[in-house]
Amino acid sequence: MSDFDENFIEMTSYWAPPSSPSPRTILAMLEQTDNGLNPISEIFPQESLPRDHTDQSGQRSGLRERLAARVGFNLPTLNTEENMSPLDAFFRSSNVPNSPVVAISPGFSPSALLHTPNMVSDSSQIIPPSSATNYGPLEMVETSGEDNAAMMMFNNDLPYQPYNVDLPSLEVFDDIATEESFYIPSYEPHVDPIGTPLVTSFESELVDDAHTDIISIEDSESEDGNKDDDDEDFQYEDEDEDQYDQDQDVDEDEEEEKDEDNVALDDPQPPPPKRRRYEVSNMIGATRTSKTQRIILQMESDEDNPNDGYRWRKYGQKVVKGNPNPRSYFKCTNIECRVKKHVERGADNIKLVVTTYDGIHNHPSPPARRSNSSSRNRSAGATIPQNQNDRTSRLGRAPPTPTPPTPPPSSYTPEEMRPFSSLATEIDLTEVYMTGISMLPNIPVYENSGFMYQNDEPTMNAMPDGSDVYDGIMERLYFKFGVDM
């Protein structure tokens, strides 16, 4: 900044004369000089221009000292011989004495000196701007070695001069974090041959992850199925047998499809379902408890649900894939038993009934149900006369006389066994009428039996059962006339 201030103060000292010509006037004078005229000597006479600047600098040393005292540091003198503009060099070449006036290019402002960090150190390196516009292509300037040449930028009259700056060498750090490469092997499921067992010994510490996932899935399915069964028991107790919930019923085909889908997620090439089930069963036997036992029975029967000695409750029915006949689902009625079964007709043979049991009963079979229709009829027949005797005893009447037993057919006479027809002789029915009336019980006759006084209590007149009377009449008709109705 000291050089900058020195140059600026020294140059401002030469700008002081207000009678200095403008740059256009100087250019016009240069053209007249080429024509043989020398108007510069008229404006700047030689007598008033000293050859050396020492006197002028000595005269103005007081201003420089005052500025130095105000700023706080001493300003060195400006050497005008070194900082010479192109116009000043031109004036010296044309035998013009040195002038304190500094020529400034058009458009130049002194304020630019305040904003530029670097002052012009060597005016010989600056290329004067050309008056012609830059419409042509740029000239390529070759630089060799450490020499720096000025280059003209496109659409810019000001020169651009690069500088070689020696930057300090950067230190190379050895502890830069670099990315380490890891080898990640591709996952290839291990498929054992069919002949080798799944689990070789109990001493092995690692088990195949794919089979472990299958076990957990099947166990969760069985547990969820048991929970669903308990929920279904309470849900379908008061409903009709034909109503069911398809979301809670899991049949065999759907279970197989789910197992195959689960294996497909873990193993891109799963083994056949039969082999997979065999492997899973071996795996479970070695580590965990097995699933519920399944028994399949086939028989020919006309009934849709053959009797097997246990009592079942139907909780669902639906049509499965591959069989047009519906499949019925049953559950054991015992509270502690969780055995289920589903019954369906064969797809090819309708007479064939296929029953599949899931689980084993943990209770004995209940006693078989017997048809007690004959015993019920006998007990009903025995209770009717007893009820009649109770009624008659309460009314103070004599019980009816029992009817004689019916004789066997061999004791019938030919006359009694002859058929009754319209061509036969007339039959006297007075005896039958009298005998039938004699069988009727004696009913007392009361006056005004249909009316009742205000303070009288109602009386109950129980009528005997008419079935005994009817039986007695029919027996007499059969014995006397052989009429069987």
From Swiss-Prot:
InterPro entries: WRKY_dom, WRKY_dom_sf, WRKY_plant. Expressed in male gametophytes (pollen) and in the endosperm of fertilized ovules. GO terms for biological process: endosperm development. Zn(2+) binds at C332, C337, H361, H363. Disulfide bonds: none annotated. One of its GO terms (cellular component) is nucleus. The keyword Metal-binding applies. Keywords: DNA-binding, Metal-binding, Nucleus, Transcription, Transcription regulation, Zinc. Residues 301-366 bind DNA. Pfam families: WRKY (PF03106). The keyword Transmembrane helix does not apply. Residues 368-380 have a biased composition (Low complexity). Residues 43-62, 215-293, 358-417 are annotated as: Disordered. Residues 216-264 have a biased composition (Acidic residues). It is found in: Nucleus. Its main location: nucleus. Residues 399-411 have a biased composition (Pro residues). One of its GO terms (molecular function) is metal ion binding. Belongs to the WRKY group I family. Interacts with IKU1. Transcription factor. Interacts specifically with the W box (5'-(T)TGAC[CT]-3'), a frequently occurring elicitor-responsive cis-acting element. Modulates seed size by negatively regulating the cellularization of syncytial endosperm. This is Probable WRKY transcription factor 10. It comes from Arabidopsis thaliana (Mouse-ear cress). The lineage of its organism: Eukaryota, Viridiplantae, Streptophyta, Embryophyta, Tracheophyta. The gene is WRKY10.
